[in-house]
Amino acid sequence: MTIRILPARLANQIAAGEVVERPASVVKELVENSLDAGATRIDIDLEKGGAKLIRIRDNGSGIDKDELGLALSRHATSKIHTLDDLEAIMSLGFRGEALASISSVSRLTLTSRTVAQEEAWSAYSEGRDMAVKLQPAAHPVGTTVEVLDLFFNTPARRKFLRTEKTEFTHIDELLKRIALSRFDVSFTLRHNGKIVRQYRAATTLPQQEKRLAAVCGNPFVQHMLRIELEHQGLKLHGWITTPEGARQQSDLQYCYVNGRMMRDKLINHAIRQSYETSLRVDQFATYVLFIELDPHQVDVNVHPAKHEVRFHQARLVHDFIYQALSSALVQGAQVMAPTINEGAFHLPHCAEEVNPPVVPMIDTTQQERVWQAVQNTPDYPRKAPRDNDRDESDNPQVRERAVSNPWVASPKTASTGKERYGSASVSKKEAAVYQTLMQTPDLSDEEPSTASTIVSSIEAVKANIAIEKLGKAIQVVAGQYLLMSSPQGCVLISLYQAQQLKLRGLLNAQHGALKAQPLLVPLALKLNESEWQVAQRHSSALLQLGIELKSRTNHSIMVMAVPQPLRQQNLQQLLPDLLSYAASCSESQALSHQALADWLTQRIVVEKRDYTLAEAIGLIAELEQLWQGNLPLQDPHFITLVDFSASITALHS
């Protein structure tokens, strides 16, 4: 067979097989051209799901008369001119194939006018006849592309089109994705003469959230968390939802790289990993995320439909997304967890302004990862199966303990879009829960007065009576201590010791070994021979603590997993120090779990000097839950009775 160069019309129709899959593909290419032209308003008109008519009108920069015919030629574009331009693409289109491919399988009319022109011009092209006809037209500054009778000259492809409703649904979903990528652009969608969607330009955050609600629905907005992070030239911003906002299908997953819609396996793998411990098998995360980075660090010319990209520093991008979302979910869980309602405090002073939490940035490691997991990841994140998918709230013992605990408020239901923090309006039920902590006790027969509490405190100090239980929180003293009442009198609690008790409670292994959480990237540690021997000798004790080590050579080990309390620590420095501590113990002395937990507690907990009353109460509430009422109330470093004798003597003198 003779080798020949294909005719232009045939080459365009072959290219159309990749570019023009269905009417939604035409809308995508034309709307992206409008966005590249700087349009701030785009109108989309459809008839019969786009099979009969697709009309895209914008107010962009327009196309000059002399370039109208060239615009319909294959590989003709204004986006790139050199190889350097191809390696630093910021525009959505760049191949110059869309208009030529569309015109080869439809009847296309391109009408445009630039600011410099006094009149508009129209170019007409029909499938079999590739000749372009120019004629004057009436049109404002901008461009209108009209596509009639899609696939009229390729019956084999036309018969694969679905019903009008199905094709319109694809276009509607496409427009939602585009509308979320450009909040500054107004979009109007008409179908068979009726306005179906209208998204007004959103320049402020409330307006953007309004568009989010219009596209993703109110449940998304009610459970969403806004994130914005930047690290080593990478920027991640957008919205994710708490696990309560998960759905049974993956229809609310929107990700963009430099403004381009993406369904990339690497990105989805990182997102799936961050939600892995939060969602059930049949749940899907919901998010709208924007990733911005140097265009030289990403290759967008790797997929015919440009749905996938290739990152030059894929490991850095993957870890950045994973750490950012994991930290945001942890912060969100702390905000949405049962908290003390400020509105129930009835304090005479105004409530302090609540600052948004700062998500910590954790340095990414530089070790080799197993990319097979990334390659096998589906297009949408799906959580891996777990041994126990039951929510903790399903346990009646947990529910009973949470309700009976006077320190913690009942879990809130989904927000209604209003402010999530406490307000002055509090129900009687909430007030009843918190009054045991926050309200000054009433002078009644059933409850001792403040004066009697002070007298009891004085008598208890003199008699050296043991403290049996805690009562009401009164005030934070010197930023580090919490003054509380008790049946034995007023007591002062060290909040620094309380933090240590909290971590010790988290590291408690009384119910078996702590659960080891695998690291996304195993950490390699270089050790000397003695440290390596210590790691081998005490591997079982470390595993009981949730630290899983794997030997590589006589001078290095791999840290495969750590317990949850250590996830946010600098393991590169902490673990060698832990092994040094283990080496300092005598060889005959068995290294107990308690000894390791005590050392970690002393090493990790940092003294804080500016506790608020709400923070102090929340800390004590966590202690009550962790220790289940068995707090060391006899520890003089943790709690002490307050002796008012000297103060009373001074008042009477």
From Swiss-Prot:
BP term (GO), one: mismatch repair
Keywords assigned by UniProt, alphabetized: DNA damage, DNA repair
Top-rank taxon: Bacteria
Biased amino acid composition, Basic and acidic residues: 380-389
Any single Pfam family the record assigns to this protein: MutL_C
Iron as UniProt keyword: no
Annotated region described as Disordered, given as residue ranges: 375-425
MF annotations from Gene Ontology: ATP binding; ATP hydrolysis activity; ATP-dependent DNA damage sensor activity; mismatched DNA binding
Listed GO CC annotations: mismatch repair complex
This protein's record includes keyword DNA damage: yes
Function of the molecule: This protein is involved in the repair of mismatches in DNA. It is required for dam-dependent methyl-directed DNA mismatch repair. May act as a 'molecular matchmaker', a protein that promotes the formation of a stable complex between two or more DNA-binding proteins in an ATP-dependent manner without itself being part of a final effector complex.
Family: Belongs to the DNA mismatch repair MutL/HexB family.
UniProt-recorded name of the protein: DNA mismatch repair protein MutL
